[in-house]
From Swiss-Prot:
Coiled coil: none annotated. This is Mitochondrial import inner membrane translocase subunit Tim29. It comes from the Eukaryota. GO terms for biological process: protein insertion into mitochondrial inner membrane. The chain crosses the membrane at residues 60-77. The gene is TIMM29. InterPro entries: TIMM29. It comes from Homo sapiens.
Length: 260
């Protein structure tokens, strides 16, 4: 009787275990359930965001604008090749200028960048929204102890002083600022009085000068009165010239006959 009870208990446990094995879902079923739950959560989040945007359109527009601006900045962040092109273009621009007309500060900044570039001490880093070019103490391939020891590396507190240029929305702003007046040499105006060394915006007449320069090549159009006046003046000048010639001839004849 005890043996029969044990057999019944054992058979019942095996049946329950078999039902549990059959009822347990597989890997793909669990992945499908997880994907459906994830999509359901995202759908609810999108519905909530849409409802919030309809309730507060101003805030939604600000968020969309910020996201769009961040995406544009991320896309337009200049690359290392863009900095190389800008540096070579700036160097070529200075070479086309006469040494006496080059801005000393612009030339010194570009020469420093070229010097660091030639020694492999320029570093480029992309921060997503913008790019940075900074100065390194050694070449990346240098094997010196000072270059490899991590205890001798520059401090992060000194990093702002080593930044050379900032790239944002497709431009390198520091290099562009130095090259803005690259063809103006302030040393040329040191001999001038103090009030003539600085020119204000109201004192510039470049547009007027350019217009007058172009007008000097245009044909002169004269009216009939101006033509008559010019002809009369020409006749008067010719008459005066003839009179002076006659007087000079008479004077020479008088001087020739005087000794006789």
């Amino acid at each position: 009787m005890a043996a029969a009870a044990l057999r019944r208990f054992w058979s019942r446990r095996r049946a329950e275990a078999g039902d549990a094995v059959v009822a347990k879902p597989g890997v793909w079923a669990r992945l499908g359930s997880w994907a459906r739950a994830l999509l359901r959560d995202y759908a609810e989040a999108c519905r909530d965001a849409s409802a919030e945007a309809r309730a507060r359109p101003g805030r939604a527009a600000v968020y969309v604008g910020l996201l769009g601006g961040a995406a544009a900045c991320f896309t337009l962040a200049p690359s290392e090749g863009a900095f190389e092109e800008a540096l070579l273009e700036a160097s070529g621009t200075l070479l086309l200028l006469a040494p006496a007309t080059r801005n000393r500060e612009s030339e010194a900044f570009v020469q420093r960048l070229l010097w660091l570039r030639g020694r492999g001490r320029l570093r480029y880093v992309n921060l997503g929204l913008c790019s940075l070019v900074y100065e390194a103490p050694f070449d990346a391939q240098a094997s010196l102890y000072q270059a490899r020891c991590r205890y001798l590396q520059p401090r992060w507190t000194d990093f702002p002083g080593r930044v050379l240029d900032v790239g944002f929305v497709g431009r390198w702003w520091v290099l562009g600022a130095w090259m803005r007046d690259c063809d103006i040499n302030d040393d040329e105006f040191l001999h001038l009085p103090a009030h003539l060394r600085v020119v204000g915006p109201q004192q510039l007449h470049s547009e007027t000068n350019e217009r007058l320069f172009d007008e000097k090549y245009k044909p002169v159009v004269l009216t009939d009165d101006q033509v008559d006046q010019a002809l009369w003046e020409e006749q008067v000048l010719q008459k005066e010239k003839k009179d002076r010639l006659a007087l000079s001839q008479a004077h020479s004849l008088v001087q020739a006959e005087a000794p006789r």
